[in-house]
Amino acid sequence: MFRVLLRSLFALVVAAVAVLIGWRVLRPAEVLATVKPPFPTAPPVFPHVTGRIPLAPLFVDDRVRVYAAKRQIRADAPPNSDTVRTAIWSFRRWPEQVSGVVAAGRTVISRWSDGDLVAIAGDTGKIVWRAQGPSASGYAGHRTGSATVWAPENLRVAGPSVLVTAGGQISAYEVSTGTRRWTSPTACDNGFTTAGGQVVCPSGAVEVATGSAVASFPAGPYTPVGCDVASSGCAGLRDAAGHGWLTSGATPVRAAALDRPDATVAAGLVFYPSGNSLRSVDPVTGVVRHDYPAAQVLGVSAGRVVLLTADRTLLAIDARSGQTVLRYPMTFLGEKLTWDPGRWQVTDRFVAVERLAKNRPDDPDTPGYYFSVDAVILAEL
């Protein structure tokens, strides 16, 4: 009898220990590691390809690179490193997942599946503020994380505000403090923000500063053009009728040259394919400015328009004079140039492009979807 009791007691102790270990492992937890001085600064640059890495970096103030994984965001520096470096700061949460990451100035704002918004100083790794918002979808960044840091779902920035959409409404939070500025009962799934300070939803636009509806705005739904990462700061749009508009000011300006479905806007000019060339024209009058080699417009860097040609040559042009100010092939250590561009980011100093295989499967999680293990190529501008 004594042995039976002893065995039962031992079994209870083992079970209790297992429960304790399981609770300690699986309980909700957060881990924050901050930067040890000296804090990162923006390095000097000269135009060339710097390296290739397996993850999509979000360049923050051209000082650090931020990466997203399922349950963690982390940063490395300097931003022109040819490989992913040891993290200078990191923030991990369990069991929540990273839904999206954006940056405004030096502040990195992450949105998590439980609805938490967490703002971290990009150069120190310290939490600046946090706010509770509506729950969000889980991690959808696949292998590189590009969808999470360059195209997050329902997370946008505009000036001093970060905007969150969920449950048929949109809310604006102050980037510096996390204070909720306003909430509008406007369905805005995957809307976009304009360079002129509006957030554009399928049914119309609201002012980022106040949350009030914009009285005079073309009818939607809309197609954004000339946007930065996170579908933010868009320089133009096409309305439901396919008419083009410039959106860099307080009021949209009609731009007939932007009516073409293959046209975009950069540095105040409209660009579209013309035969074997890329043509720039005045957005309002349509007067031709310059022709360039056939290329895709990636964005604007310190006033220069950045292009990627079909043979994967990177160009930066002065849109006013038409002069090419830099040119080099987007290859590292003799890699082939047989890849398709996926997503990308252009800043004043850097460009990063996700490279996809030419004959790839539809599923990003299927082997052979990306061009190589180090799918993202980096360059200085």
Language model regions located:
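Secretory-pathway ectodomains
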Residues: 2-381
